[in-house]
Design a protein with these regions (language model features):
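Bacterial Sec-dependent N-terminal signal peptides
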Residues: 1-23
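Beta-strand-rich N-terminal accessory domains
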Residues: 21-91
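Extended, loop-rich substrate-binding clefts of extracytoplasmic carbohydrate-active enzymes
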Residues: 86-172
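Contiguous beta-strand segments within globular domains
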Residues: 42, 172-174
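Generic structural motif
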Residues: 15, 41-43, 53, 65, ...
Length: 174
């Protein structure tokens, strides 16, 4: 793939609370924890996780304005009576099922070593820009095979918006 441009728009409606027009989106970079925390006013909305132990970067957990977590706990923080299937489905993320025959969608730490050669890894390479004035941050990653050979270079800008009744973010890929 020479050029990949995709826009994903997710709109998360507020359950019990309404945010004022003058709400502020704030990013806190936490390099030691390998994450960027995204706050709306003083309330955590989500975190962009880019740990070396992940097979792709994710937004996790995601909360409503009333504080209800809308992402499941497993596999990061399993909850009582929660199913423990699909370890690759953590939070909100972007991936493909097949690029040059490699599965970037289903990869996780539960794949047997003898099957790893069939799976790709999205390796975080850096934060390019955090722009609170425009409510967005840009990150870069390499899509690699199990030996580290780079198939794609990704540059993603996460943009966040707040209105009276909903919050949203978009994730255009370049």
């Amino acid at each position: 793939m020479n050029k990949l441009i995709l826009l994903i728009l997710f709109s998360l409606s507020y359950c019990n609370a309404v945010i004022g027009q003058d709400s502020h989106i704030h990013f806190i970079e936490k390099p030691d924890s390998q994450k960027i925390s995204i706050y709306i006013d003083q309330t955590l909305f989500t975190e962009f996780l880019y740990s070396d132990t992940l097979y792709k970067q994710v937004l996790y957990p995601i909360y409503t304005a009333s504080g209800t977590e809308i992402t499941r706990g497993y596999p990061a923080r399993p909850k009582a009576d929660e199913r423990t299937d699909h370890p690759h489905q953590m939070g909100l993320w972007f991936s493909f099922g097949s690029i040059n025959g490699l599965d970037f969608w289903n990869n996780s730490n539960r794949i047997p070593l003898d099957k790893k050669e069939h799976y790709g890894i999205i390796r975080f390479t850096g934060i390019k820009n955090i722009n609170e004035k425009e409510n967005q941050f840009t990150v870069e990653a390499n899509w690699t095979n199990h030996n580290g050979y780079i198939l794609l270079k990704e540059k993603t800008t996460y943009a966040f918006t707040v209105s009276h009744t909903k919050e949203a973010f978009s994730e255009p890929l370049h």
